[in-house]
């Protein structure tokens, strides 16, 4: 997979690529990651990328020209590439959407800043606006990194143990159940006996039951979707 990120904050992505999942994917040759400083595509000597909004209002809006220049300069192909813009106006990001994106050949992220992006960019370039949650971030680049991390770990071969993906939260609309490791007893708290029984069927049923109980208690939206067989 190839991922391009057009941003005013390239170090957010670059520093993340030096650690964890992104580093593994790059090292294994399963990911190509290119980060593009938006200011490099501004035409004027001041490298201006934003301006006041028409009609008035607070803040500044990212301009069309540098964004179009950037996306076109990196070889954007409208019919093959998926252009993503993290945005409060977007569809809700979830595990199923992460899976869908992990199967794409190339993702191009346009990261907003300030009061947002000129709507003509959204209308003409963007295929998918994605919202990672109902809260405000200082930069769309942070949201893009969340999406990228979630997507890249689903690329076959990135994780050392692909089976671990099947046991994670949100698979089959369930939160992952409790996990324990050594020591067997810490202070007055012991590991549940069933996990020490060696009976794999009992352990599987126990984990499923606690996973269901946790989901019903903590995420009623997931629980209801599971019962209905719907996508969150």
UniProtKB/Swiss-Prot annotation:
GO terms for biological process: tRNA N1-guanine methylation. Its main location: cytoplasm. SUPFAM superfamilies: alpha/beta knot. It catalyses: guanosine(37) in tRNA + S-adenosyl-L-methionine = N(1)-methylguanosine(37) in tRNA + S-adenosyl-L-homocysteine + H(+). Its EC number is 2.1.1.228. S-adenosyl-L-methionine binds at residues 112, 132-137. Homodimer. Belongs to the RNA methyltransferase TrmD family. This is tRNA (guanine-N(1)-)-methyltransferase. It comes from Methylacidiphilum infernorum (isolate V4).
């Amino acid at each position: 997979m190839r991922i391009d990120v057009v941003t005013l904050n390239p170090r957010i992505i670059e520093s993340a690529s030096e650690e964890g999942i992104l580093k593994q994917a790059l090292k294994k040759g399963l990911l190509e990651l290119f980060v593009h400083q938006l200011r490099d595509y501004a035409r004027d000597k001041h490298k201006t990328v934003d301006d006041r909004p028409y009609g008035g209002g607070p803040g500044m809006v990212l301009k069309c020209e540098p964004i179009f220049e950037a996306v076109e300069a990196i070889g954007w192909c409208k019919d093959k590439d998926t252009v993503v813009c993290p945005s409060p106006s977007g569809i809700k990001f979830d595990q199923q959407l992460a899976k869908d994106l992990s199967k794409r050949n190339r993702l191009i992220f346009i990261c907003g800043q300030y009061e947002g992006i000129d709507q003509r960019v959204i209308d003409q370039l963007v295929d998918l606006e994605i919202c990672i949650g109902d809260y405000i971030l200082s930069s769309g680049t942070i949201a893009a990194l969340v999406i990228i991390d979630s997507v890249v770990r689903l690329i076959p071969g990135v994780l050392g143990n692909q089976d671990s993906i099947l046991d994670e939260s949100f698979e089959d609309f369930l939160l992952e159940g409790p996990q324990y490791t050594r020591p067997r007893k810490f202070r007055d708290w012991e590991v549940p006996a069933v996990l020490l029984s060696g009976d794999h069927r009992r352990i599987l049923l126990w984990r499923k039951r606690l996973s269901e109980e946790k989901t019903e208690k903590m995420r009623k939206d997931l629980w209801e979707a599971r019962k209905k067989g719907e996508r969150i």
